[in-house]
């Protein structure tokens, strides 16, 4: 099974064409996750802290969500839809309780009303409630901190080295591994986001209670390939 170590979304259009707008760096930094954020539930796409991902927004309710977010703090939450979501997709289908908040770094509003956005992961969150005052979903959330103690950073660095070696062993010919200059945190999350696996397995990685636990799970997964 091939590894997806570069983001490849069928809906992606590069945000380098005329009309793309960047969000100023000062606005793109969130010192704390808001108590309430809009949710963007998706069937086959996850986001991890420190990673970037492009999206095309075409449903009217989510166009409104992006327009509102751009007027506010630029933050939305990516959550994975649970199996069976098709029965109530137009309403409020079942979702997982842990997601990742992201800030809109770049966006482009197309003539037909669609948005192209580049989203940068900020932090994982836990949903503690929902509000139904908007056409899109709003959730009350709590941030799930991924802070590391000094001794845990040593462990994470060792696990990152294991992951790098295992990736080199299974990468298809011509594929590029992640940038070796990345911080350990970012490296682990980029591999977790882009390694080819079922989305339910990726959700399991997202829900790990620490970066060390996530890295250990990645090592175990790569060793089974």
Descriptions of predicted regions:
Residues 2-14:
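Bacterial N-terminal signal peptides
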Residues 21-225:
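N-terminal low-complexity, acidic/polar interaction/targeting segments
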């Amino acid at each position: 099974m091939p590894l997806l170590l570069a983001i490849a979304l069928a809906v992606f259009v590069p945000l380098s064409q005329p009309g793309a707008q960047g969000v100023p760096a000062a606005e793109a930094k969130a010192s704390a996750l808001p108590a309430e954020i809009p949710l963007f539930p998706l069937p086959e796409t996850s986001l991890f802290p420190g990673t970037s991902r492009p999206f095309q927004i075409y449903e009217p309710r989510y166009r409104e969500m992006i327009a509102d977010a751009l007027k506010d703090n630029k933050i939305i939450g990516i959550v994975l839809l649970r199996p069976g979501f098709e029965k109530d997709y137009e309403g409020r289908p079942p979702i997982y309780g842990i997601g990742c908040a992201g800030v809109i770094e770049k966006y482009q509003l197309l003539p037909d009303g669609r948005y192209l956005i580049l989203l940068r992961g900020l932090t994982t969150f836990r949903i503690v409630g929902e509000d139904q005052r908007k056409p899109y979903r709003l959730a009350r959330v709590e941030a799930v901190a991924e802070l590391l103690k000094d001794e845990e950073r040593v462990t994470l660095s060792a696990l990152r080295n294991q992951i790098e070696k295992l990736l080199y062993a299974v990468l298809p010919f011509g594929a590029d591994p992640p940038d070796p200059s990345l911080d350990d945190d970012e490296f682990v999350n980029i591999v977790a986001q882009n390694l080819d696996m079922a989305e339910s397995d990726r959700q399991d990685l997202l829900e790990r209670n620490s970066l060390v636990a996530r890295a250990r799970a990645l090592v175990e997964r790569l060793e089974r390939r």
